[in-house]
Amino acid sequence: MRTVDRPNEVHYDFEESCYVEGDSQSLVKVKAKSDPPARGGEQCAVLPVFQAAFLVQDVDTNSYMILNPATAQWFFTRPLGGCEMFVAKGSTRQDVLVIHSNLDRCRNKVGNLQEKGASVDEMMGRHPGYHLIARVYSEPPAAEKPAADAYMRGYERGHPGILTIAYNNQPPTTLQYFQFIGHYNDAQYWIFTVKGEIDGKVFGRIQVR
């Protein structure tokens, strides 16, 4: 279900629309419920442990979802190519709010970083039961990096304890999109992984403990 909280802010409820196949925490493939499972993988389509929540990316919007591991133990969103992800924790480590920020109204990277950070801070004010624990962002071009780094240092000071992870799609690194995958593991906490879609390089992990 899609609920527009306000302009540029949309809440998505979990719908049983996808599941995962794979053999490890990050080597998985998400499939629509309408897709037949691979031979031998029939259980993936029906067992709760394989169910996945998918967060839609909306244009110029902060899309968010509150995860429920009793319903789905995997989380996916659209591949990242400049968007940011924010993770907020509620009163328990099972209670997690995830935001896909696709605001892109500024002409420069530093402006985009500032706008996304400020908009999510404002949003958190409307969700007082949650606090931000992580932010995933794309590194800017070299010319903007000093100003962006200065902004991020100030952002981290204003958000004590927050984990920030940068992914890099600037040359000479591999030109690719990036996956943001969440898994509620056997130890009963969420782990989110940021990794390259082509080279598989892991840029960081977020553990919600």
Residue spans for each PLM region:
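Active-site microenvironment for binding and transforming phosphate-containing groups
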Residues: 1-209
